[in-house]
From Swiss-Prot:
This is C-type lectin domain family 7 member A. GO terms for cellular component: cell surface; cytoplasm; membrane; plasma membrane. Gene3D superfamilies: Mannose-Binding Protein A, subunit A. The gene is CLEC7A. Glycans are attached at residue 91. Highly expressed in peripheral blood leukocytes and dendritic cells. Detected in spleen, bone marrow, lung, muscle, stomach and placenta. It comes from Homo sapiens.
């Protein structure tokens, strides 16, 4: 058997070469795996970011859709309300038979509908056939009389027990104040007279006197709560004006 040293070297070199090739391939595989591992995280991060962006866009789309629906509904409600308001204005602008009757008979409006179509001026109170003003200006009896005249009225004249009850109810809410009425006399020895010249009847109410030795001549009358007194005409007080009207 011949010995071939070159073949041995080839075998040895071949083996060695193959060994080196195997190691080289192993290193390349390891490097490839490391490279793929290193490249993986950026792609995952990008995928997560894209997912979040998609979710945000979806939420925005839902919100915008909801707002659009709400605006559409509110717009339709506004148009509907405007329609009813315009219809109400048309109805109120058209006079009816009842409104014409109320304008002719104002007291009917007060009694039946409560609408303020009163023949009385502002701040006056209507009762039966008269308007009343409870003036809060302090004046003597003569000054109060002039004030009522300037307003086209007279100081109060009480004609009935019902009217007296109405006046008492009004002044009782001001227990610290007294109010001049249209009852006076020129001197102590003569009867009491209303402003229209008619004589006072004690059957309606009694006049309590405040006469004293110092003030012997109280020739004017005022009402305090539910009691009617004579008083010096020069004493400042409030007053009640009355204006009658035809039914």
């Amino acid at each position: 058997m011949e010995y071939h040293p070159d073949l041995e070297n080839l075998d040895e070199d071949g083996y060695t070469q193959l060994h080196f090739d195997s190691q080289s391939n192993t290193r390349i595989a390891v490097v490839s795996e490391k490279g793929s591992c290193a490249a993986s995280p950026p792609w995952r991060l990008i995928a997560v970011i894209l997912g979040i962006l998609c979710l945000v866009i979806l939420v925005i789309a839902v919100v915008l859709g909801t707002m659009a629906i709400w605006r559409s509904n509110s717009g339709s409600n506004t148009l509907e309300n405007g329609y009813f308001l315009s219809r109400n204005k048309e109805n109120h602008s058209q006079p009816t038979q009842s409104s014409l009757e109320d304008s002719v008979t104002p007291t009917k409006a007060v009694k039946t509908t409560g609408v303020l179509s009163s023949p009385c001026p502002p701040n006056w109170i209507i009762y039966e056939k008269s308007c009343y003003l409870f003036s809060m200006s302090l004046n003597s009896w003569d000054g109060s009389k002039r004030q009522c005249w300037q307003l086209g009225s007279n100081l109060l004249k009480i004609d009935s027990s019902n009217e007296l009850g109405f006046i008492v109810k009004q002044v009782s809410s001001q227990p610290d104040n007294s109010f001049w009425i249209g009852l006076s006399r020129p001197q102590t020895e003569v009867p009491w007279l209303w402003e229209d010249g008619s004589t006072f009847s004690s059957n309606l109410f009694q006049i309590r006197t405040t006469a004293t030795q110092e003030n012997p001549s109280p020739n004017c009358v005022w009402i305090h709560v539910s009691v009617i007194y004579d008083q010096l005409c020069s004493v400042p007080s409030y007053s009640i004006c009355e204006k009658k009207f035809s039914m």
